[in-house]
Amino acid sequence: MAKLYFYYSTMNAGKSTTLLQSSYNYRERDMNTLVYTAAIDDRFGVGKVTSRIGISQDAFLFRSETNLFDEINEHLKKEKVHCVLVDEAQFLSKQQVYQLSDVVDKLKIPVLCYGLRTDFQAELFEGSKYLLAWADQLEELKTICYCGRKANFVLRLNDQGEVIKEGAQIQIGGNDSYLSVCRLHYKEKCGQI
């Protein structure tokens, strides 16, 4: 039975690596996957899902105006699709999460979404909010804070490594711009304790 999955975490937990491994597992068994990533995240090249360990795969892009159900349904006219995988799923809109649920419910294709749960201000991203609400299965991918505890928050840093507390929710960056930390160190670094 097809399901909508949401694999969420803070940064540097291996979301893209896990997505790429899942896609590989399907393809190794001669099953087709459709891989999507957000058009606004071009850190490793446009139309690529790339992990920090150096593996990558070409991907279709989704933008705010992309109708994922229509696009996937159109792709089915060319070839069978066994699984849809979405990287950077926090950037999905509410409507796109709904469209992906239709892919599961109407087209009977499993959809695996990978993304951040919250931003640097500990607020849910729109895509994450609706995936947490509507996914059939939720799984947290874990990473650790510099103290060794489970990291479940992310700090945004400036060029000097100082914590930024305000700004736009979306700013594309990697290890140089963000640091995954535990709740205690998030509150401490943000001046909340």
Swiss-Prot record:
Its EC number is 2.7.1.21. It catalyses: thymidine + ATP = dTMP + ADP + H(+). The keyword Ribonucleoprotein does not apply. InterPro entries: P-loop_NTPase, Thymidine_kinase, Thymidine_kinase_CS. GO terms for biological process: DNA biosynthetic process; thymidine metabolic process. Zn(2+) binds at residues 145, 147, 182, 185. GO terms for cellular component: cytosol. It is an enzyme of class 2 (transferase). GO terms for molecular function: ATP binding; thymidine kinase activity; zinc ion binding. It is found in: Cytoplasm. Its main location: cytoplasm. It comes from the Bacteria. The active site is at 88 (proton acceptor). Keywords: ATP-binding, Cytoplasm, DNA synthesis, Kinase, Metal-binding, Nucleotide-binding, Transferase, Zinc. Belongs to the thymidine kinase family. Homotetramer. This is Thymidine kinase. It comes from Haemophilus influenzae (strain ATCC 51907 / DSM 11121 / KW20 / Rd). The gene is tdk.
